[in-house]
């Protein structure tokens, strides 16, 4: 994974208040912070989606499916470890974790059972 994902967030010395996302390796989630607008480091993303797609690891597949307390009603995909497959869920838009994907294909690529796609080609 990108080395910058392992860094903590950095607001930088400037005084802007730009809402950005950084990857928190401990919680395996992308969290918000306010970026000053200059310097900082590479663990700084304009969207939660870009942050997750850059920094998430396969361990995210073992995390619980978290709707979060907000009420945005975004349809996403997550890996259900009990069912062993990717399922749809409604994400509230905040305080989620790395087990959220923007398409079934993306979820399967990260968390799918190895060889599943190959077997479909043989049928």
Swiss-Prot record:
Role description: This inhibitory fragment, released from native ITI after limited proteolysis with trypsin, contains two homologous domains. Whereas the second domain is a strong inhibitor of trypsin, the first domain interacts weakly with PMN-granulocytic elastase and not at all with pancreatic elastase.
Residue ranges constituting the BPTI/Kunitz inhibitor domain according to the UniProt record: 5-55, 61-111
Tagged with keyword Disulfide bond: yes
Residues with glycosylation annotation: 24
Protein name stated in the entry: Inter-alpha-trypsin inhibitor
Family matches, as PROSITE patterns: BPTI_KUNITZ_1, BPTI_KUNITZ_2
Site positions per UniProt: Reactive bond for trypsin: 71-72
Disulfide bond entries: 5-55, 14-38, 30-51, 61-111, 70-94, 86-107
């Amino acid at each position: 994974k990108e080395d910058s994902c392992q860094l903590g967030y950095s607001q930088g010395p400037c005084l802007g208040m730009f809402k950005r996302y950084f990857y928190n390796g401990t919680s395996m989630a992308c969290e918000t912070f306010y970026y000053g607008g200059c310097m900082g480091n590479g663990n700084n993303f304009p969207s939660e989606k870009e942050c997750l797609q850059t920094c998430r690891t396969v361990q995210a597949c073992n995390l619980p499916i978290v709707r979060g307390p907000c009420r945005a009603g975004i349809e996403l995909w997550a890996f259900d470890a009990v069912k062993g497959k990717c399922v749809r869920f409604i994400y509230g838009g905040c305080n989620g974790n790395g087990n959220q994907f923007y398409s079934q294909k993306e979820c399967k690529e990260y968390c799918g059972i190895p060889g599943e796609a190959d077997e479909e080609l043989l049928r």
